[in-house]
Amino acid sequence: MKLIIATRKSQLALWQSEHVAQILKNTHQIEVLLEGFKTKGDVLLDSPLAKIGGKGLFTKELEESMLRKEAHLAVHSLKDVPSFFPQGLVLAAVSKREQSTDAMLSQNYKDFLSLPKGAKIGTTSLRRKMQLLLLRPDLEIISLRGNVNSRIEKLKNNEFDAIILAMAGIKRLNLDKQVNFVYEFSKDELIPAASQGALGIESIKDEKILELLKCLNDENALIETSIEREFIATLEGGCQVPIGINAELLGDEICVRAVLGLPDGSEILKDKRMIKKNDFKGFGEGLAKEFITKGAKELLKKAESII
C-alpha cells in the first residue's frame, strides 16, 4: 500500500510531514510520499494574519486535495487546525507533544527583562502581542510574516530587537544555533496557543487508513489538546483572535491556564486551574462557559473590531 501526505512547502511543514512519514514507514513497512501545496496563508505574506483571517488559512488547500482523492492525509501544526472538519475528513491522530511554550530570539538581549524601553518585537500573533504588552507596555510590537529563514534574517539585519516563535519549531529546525540568545517564556508569562507543539494528522474517513494512523496517537497529547480545542470551540474563537489556552499534565493532575482579551493588553480575562486527570472530559467547555459569563464573547467581538 502507498500513502500520500498533503503538506505545505515551508521548511517546518516539510519537517513535520517527513517526521510522520518516517514513523509510518518504520511501523508498517509501506511506501509514503509527500505532495506539496501552497495554502492561502503561504501566499498572502504582505498582510497581518489577523486581517486576512478566516478559518483554515493554512489547511484548506490540503483538505481540498484529500477530498479530490489526491492525498490520504495531511500533517498540520494542530494549533492551525479549525475545531470542525469538512464532511469526509477527520482528525485521525494527535502525535506526542513537544514543548508548547513560546520563546524570544535575539542577537543582543539575553532575556525579556533586558529588552530596552521601546524595543521592536516581531510576531504574527495577537495572542502573543496581548500578553507581551500586558507584561511590558513600553515595547513596540510589529507584525512579522514570512518563512522562518526570512524572519531570522530580519532579526540579524537589526530590523527587530527580538522575535517571538514557538519553542517546538525552534527545536525542530535547530534555530537556537542561528541566533545568540533564546529566552523561553514560562507558561505563566505567556500562555501558549491551543494545541501549540502538537501535530494533528487529518485524514479521509477510511477504516484502513485510520487503522494505519493509530500508531501516531499519544494519549497525553490527546487529553491536553482536547481540553484546549474544546475551550476554543465553545468560544468560537479562531487562531486569529487573542486567545491562549494550555493544559499541562502533571502526574495525575492537569494545570490549565487560559487568557483572552484585547490585542493591546488593556482588557483581559485570565484564569489558572488545577484539575484531576480523570476530570478532563468537558472541562474545556465548562471553563469557556465561565469566561462567557464574565463577558468573553463581548471582549472578543471588541478585539475583532479593532484588529
Curated annotation (Swiss-Prot):
One of its GO terms (molecular function) is hydroxymethylbilane synthase activity. Keywords: Porphyrin biosynthesis, Transferase. Its EC number is 2.5.1.61. Binds 1 dipyrromethane group covalently. The keyword Transferase applies. Its cofactor is dipyrromethane. The modification S-(dipyrrolylmethanemethyl)cysteine is found at residue 239. GO terms for biological process: protoporphyrinogen IX biosynthetic process. GO terms for cellular component: cytoplasm. Coiled coil: none annotated. Pathway: Porphyrin-containing compound metabolism; protoporphyrin-IX biosynthesis; coproporphyrinogen-III from 5-aminolevulinate: step 2/4. SUPFAM superfamilies: Periplasmic binding protein-like II, Porphobilinogen deaminase (hydroxymethylbilane synthase), C-terminal domain. The porphobilinogen subunits are added to the dipyrromethane group. PANTHER family: PORPHOBILINOGEN DEAMINASE. Belongs to the HMBS family. Tetrapolymerization of the monopyrrole PBG into the hydroxymethylbilane pre-uroporphyrinogen in several discrete steps. Monomer. This is Porphobilinogen deaminase. It comes from Campylobacter jejuni subsp. doylei (strain ATCC BAA-1458 / RM4099 / 269.97). The gene is hemC.
